[in-house]
Amino acid sequence: MRNYKMVVFDCDGTLVDSAIMIAMLYEGYRKMYPNRSFLPYEHFIPCYFQSDQENCAYLQIPKEDKERFEDICFHQLEFGMSSVKPFSGINEVLIEIRKLGYEVGIATSRSYEAFYGIREQLSKEVFDCFSCIGVQDVVHYMKPAPDVLLYIMEQTGLPKEQLLFVGDSMNDARCAKAAGVDFVWAKWGSIGTEVFPCMYAAEKPEELLFLL
């Protein structure tokens, strides 16, 4: 078994089941731009894996509309962010990883503001497990570029061999490969049929404990 010192998690689709956000963007877009050409639900699926800036460019949301668009999508709709919940077992696994003496980190394409929003979904005990948080605000290039993992290595002083990155998307897998970090495919959060290159594949969060 490798000598890991830190387990780094992606956020959406790995810690929290936020697939509902696809529907939020779909409905919010229709509400904000009723006169634009219709876009099918499938068009919004890539938004699940992209940053806020990438989504605005992808959906052609002008900069001056961004704040209102996000408010409509994530706060005004009936199924708001309160619908986003941690995956079953993830809270217990995070706490157990810390008890075993490993550091726990975050590598997400969310902004600081958006990431800290998951405090509403995670308990204080779980949120306090994170000793290093990498978000879009601290890097030049987001996943699949390796920047966010390189940032975590820089902040912690840990070499790539001592990090294990857990994620649910091809962007996560490519980020890990580019950084030279072992990757665990969090299959519990996958929303499609695509197969990702990985060192390990885990069907449930609890399986992570057997990799440490």
Give the positions of each predicted feature.
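Flexible domain-boundary/linker segments
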Residues: 24, 30, 43, 61, ...
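N-terminal helical cap/lid subdomain that shapes the substrate entry/recognition surface
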Residues: 2-100
